[in-house]
Amino acid sequence: SQQTCCGALFQHRGELHHAATLAQQNKVVFEKLKLDSIISTASGCGVQLLESGVGNDNCPVIDINQFLVTAEGWKGVKIASLPQTILVHDPCSLRNVLAGHEYAYQLISLIPDAQVIPLAGNDQCCGAAGTYFIEQSGVANILREGKVSAVMSNESLYLVTSNVGCALYMADGLYEKGVSIEVMHPVTLLARQMGLQL
């Protein structure tokens, strides 16, 4: 068998048996590989892998921002300048559970001339919250409106976030308001400045 979905969305919907089945499949696969760590590219998935017991002390779950920032060899890497303001959204999962939101800032700060600014209201949820934006759309839209307003009060061309659900939900809200801003993962923006296509 192979690596599969982390099961977070099933967990959020209350489908605990399905989420546990996926977690067990991942645990078996990862244990066979004898990994040093599990790198997660989406903070919500990282939390699910951690809390479902897939990651452990011998094989911790590490967010990709942290993994890259703590990697050696950055001095020789050519990164194109980007003299722009880059807003950083802190996903609740990264800030409150994985406790690693500062790594996204450090990663984006590797881009020369970038002005890295936290999105106002980062201590509050954007409203996506797994499946919350589907199940409680009214409240979720109110939460998102605060994020959209914070983006609109800046003249930034870039908003980075480490959670795919947050990215999609905020991008949709910004699109509805006619705001022209790219919403992407911090790694995607850094890769672009390195001349890589993800």
Predicted regions mapped to residue ranges:
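Iron-sulfur cluster-binding electron-transfer modules in prokaryotic oxidoreductases
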Residues: 1-198
